[in-house]
Amino acid sequence: MLHTTQIRMVGTGSAFSKKFYNNSALVTFTNGYNLLIDCGHSVPKGLHDADIPLESIDGILITHTHADHIGGLEEVALYNKFVLGGRKIDLLVPNTLVESLWENSLKGGLRYSDTYDDLSLSDYFTVRSLKTFTSGAARTQLEENIAIKLYPTFHVSHMASYAVGLEDRGEDKVFYSSDTIFDEYLIDYALTYSWVFHDCQFFTGGVHASLDELLNYIPEEDQDRVFLMHYGDNMEDFFTKTGRMRFALQGRTYIL
């Protein structure tokens, strides 16, 4: 058993990054449960390069259905089923996304195989539907000492997307924004957690919070608890322009 929660950043890049893998984090809770948040198309390669075997992952949580967050699921599903002998891991999906994740994203590549016909998502994963609300936090108990809170985010019109609050042994430990525009109310929720991992872009406008918006809103005394992620390939140009916030670095493990 670990003494504290750990996060390893498998990828920290934006959807179009070529220097960094798709934004994804492997969370290890104090009871040893390994949860991968999001699995974009480049994440399986990121796991391989970080020497993280799929066998070590207990569950994957999906925050929304853009390809840089779900594009690696087909590979994971097929590898577990046909290389690892049908091993099923947890797939944690917001209840608003379960149907669309399969019908609109994964079904085309996973419905049929050379030995099986008309497969479903539950043939590959132990699907665990997570509660959602239209505002505020919806809490789902995952295991005895682990709970997941989902917060709806504004990312792209007509697409459900969620930030994630991670509770470990009763403590609101980590807030993980995934993808969101700048949202004062969401940041207020985030700052109730011990640590914050927030997406960041280097211009204002579009579908992510900008560095300037975060700098101007988050109090200086709270900025040292904030790590910036989901950034562009020009991240190094802004390395000294983040106030007391820091960039989450790909491959780095954060002991929280």
Curated annotation (Swiss-Prot):
InterPro entries: Anti-Pycsar_Apyc1, Metallo-B-lactamas, RibonucZ/Hydroxyglut_hydro
Protein name according to UniProt: Anti-Pycsar protein Apyc1
Record-listed Zn(2+) 1 binding positions: 68-69, 179, 230
Source organism of the structure: Bacillus phage BSP38
Reported cofactor(s): Zn(2+)
A matching Pfam family: Anti-Pycsar_Apyc1
Active site: 74, 112
Family: Belongs to the anti-Pycsar protein Apyc1 family.
GO molecular function per UniProt: 3'-tRNA processing endoribonuclease activity; metal ion binding
Domain of life where this protein originates: Viruses
Gene Ontology biological-process entries: symbiont-mediated suppression of host innate immune response
Functional note: Counteracts the host Pycsar antiviral defense system. Phosphodiesterase that enables metal-dependent hydrolysis of host cyclic nucleotide Pycsar defense signals such as cCMP and cUMP.
Catalytic activity: 3',5'-cyclic CMP + H2O = CMP + H(+); 3',5'-cyclic UMP + H2O = UMP + H(+)
Entry's cofactor comment: Coordinates 2 Zn(2+) ions. One protomer coordinates the metal ions and the opposing protomer provides the catalytic residues required for cCMP hydrolysis.
Binding site for Zn(2+) 2: 64, 66, 155
Keyword Transmembrane helix annotated: no
Keywords: Host-virus interaction, Hydrolase, Inhibition of host innate immune response by virus, Metal-binding, Viral immunoevasion, Zinc
Oligomeric and partner information: Homodimer.
Lineage, broadest ranks: Viruses, Duplodnaviria, Heunggongvirae, Uroviricota, Caudoviricetes
Keyword Zinc carried by entry: yes
Region Beta-lactamase-like: start-end pairs: 21-230
